[in-house]
Design a protein with these regions (language model features):
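Non-transmembrane accessory domains of multi-pass membrane transporters/channels
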Residues: 190-194, 348-388
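Membrane-spanning helices that line or support transport/gating and their immediate boundary helices
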Residues: 62-65, 109, 113, 162-174, ...
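Short, positively charged and aromatic/hydrophobic N-terminal segments
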Residues: 1-10, 14, 19
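Conserved glycine-bearing catalytic or ligand-binding loops at nucleotide- and phosphate-handling centers
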Residues: 179-182, 276, 283-284, 329-360
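Membrane-interface segments at loop-to-transmembrane junctions
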Residues: 29-38, 67-68, 85-103, 129-140, ...
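Gly/Lys-enriched N-terminal cap/neck module of very large, oligomeric protein machines
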Residues: 21-139, 168
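Hydrophobic alpha-helical transmembrane segments
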Residues: 40-47, 51, 55-71, 91-101, ...
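Transmembrane helix-loop junctions at the membrane interface of multipass transporters and ion channels
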Residues: 51-64, 82-88, 111-143, 249-256, ...
Length: 388
């Protein structure tokens, strides 16, 4: 009976801990009541809506809205990644990466449809967002736009995606290799009484979640790589198909068709490749935050300012560049003055802090009570008499 009562209390305690943990996660992640009540419906509706975009023709204003939302969503994910303390704070990132990739490909299909069907009507036929990226971003020069698009694809595919995928692969491998040692350490702390049963369960669960997360990120990086390759193929299809439709079906001149469809195709490629670059950067930031103790900006700034001598040497080197004939003196002098001012301020603050700590130690030494010989208690003499 006593064993059953203890088992019931333990089960009730575990359920209470689970409910409290779920409530804390809900309170921390969702502060808006509407999103809290309808989060599952919104997620399912979003996925279904993404699939509908692949087969449903969109008007230009709705395509503008969705393209703007894609840029906003990618920027939000990137900023969330910079404020993470540890990767498990964003454990849903692999699923978000898959959904974002699918959404971006759906927008590519929708924009391809509208470019091929209505591209002969002019640059505004595919919406104002694609027109703006085709005209304003690349100055209306489709050759420059094509070069910029290919550069972005190479950066995304060969640099960021490859690097983040390698980080995720290595992190997953080392996390799995370190799991037995971490489990033994938790068991040793539990047996020694340093931690309780609930804390041991929480640590084991966190280790398992960490291994699952890095394994999922290792696979999710392939989505980004495939998305970049698909973006290049879709761009080529838009260009070749647009030229064929414009010249053969709509009777356009070859030069006009090349300028119109190339401008629309490059604008479409840029408006989808820039969010892809943001998501890839966010993936690299998230998987590289394994041993961090603070946010990205605070951690980088504190670690750089920890070495003011290096900043001072960089200031001297920049000043030397300013004296080289042919190099612009004003930018190098300005950067040299800024770096020198930062180094001087950091060194001065460190010296002031060191002086305060020394003064504090002197004051503590003076106020510390000293032991005196007079205050030593007297020892009673003990005598033992044997016999008479």
């Amino acid at each position: 009976k006593m064993h059953k009562s203890y088992h019931e209390r333990n089960l009730t305690c575990q359920q209470g801990w689970g409910i409290m943990e779920l409530a804390d996660q809900t309170d921390q992640s969702m502060g808006i009541p509407f999103l809290t009540r309808n989060s599952e419906i919104m997620a399912a509706g979003g996925v279904v809506g993404i699939l509908i975009l692949m087969v449903m023709p969109l008007p230009p204003f709705l395509l503008d809205l969705l393209l703007s939302f894609n840029i906003t969503f990618a920027l939000t994910i990137l900023l969330v990644g910079t404020y993470l303390l540890k990767p498990l704070d964003f454990s849903s990132f692999p699923s978000i990466l898959l959904i974002a990739t699918l959404f971006r490909l759906s927008l590519n299909i929708a924009s391809t449809r509208i470019i091929l069907l209505h591209g002969s009507e002019g640059p505004a036929a595919a919406g104002n967002v694609i027109k703006a990226f085709g005209n304003f971003v690349v100055g209306g020069n489709y050759v420059v736009g094509a070069i910029v698009f290919m550069v972005l694809v190479i950066i995304n595919l060969m640099v960021i995606t490859k690097g983040s995928g390698r980080i995720g692969e290595v992190a997953a491998r080392f996390t799995l290799d370190a799991m037995p040692g971490k489990q033994m350490s938790i068991d040793a702390d539990l047996n020694a009484g340093f931690i309780g049963e609930e804390e041991a369960k929480a640590r084991r669960k966190e280790i398992s979640r960490e291994a699952d997360f890095y394994g999922a990120m290792d696979g999710a990086s392939k989505f980004v790589k495939g998305d970049a390759i698909a973006g290049v193929i879709i761009t080529l299809i838009n260009l070749v198909g647009g030229l064929a439709i414009g010249v053969l079906q709509n009777g356009m001149d070859i030069a006009d068709a090349a300028q119109t469809y190339t401008l629309l195709t490059v604008g479409d490629g840029l408006v989808t490749q820039i969010p892809a670059l943001m998501i890839s950067t966010a993936a690299g930031i998230v998987v590289s935050r394994a041993g961090s103790q603070s946010t990205l900006g605070r951690e980088v700034l504190s670690q750089i300012l920890r070495q003011p001598k290096a900043i001072g040497i960089a200031s001297a080197v920049l000043f030397g560049f300013a004296l080289v004939p042919g190099l612009p003196a004003v930018p190098f002098l300005a950067l040299s003055m800024i770096a020198g001012g930062v180094a001087y301020t950091v060194i001065k603050s460190k010296k002031a802090e060191q002086k305060k700590s020394e003064e504090r130690e002197v004051i503590e030494e003076k106020t510390r009570p000293r032991e005196r010989l007079e205050s030593t208690p007297l020892v009673d003499i003990l005598a033992l008499e044997v016999g008479y």
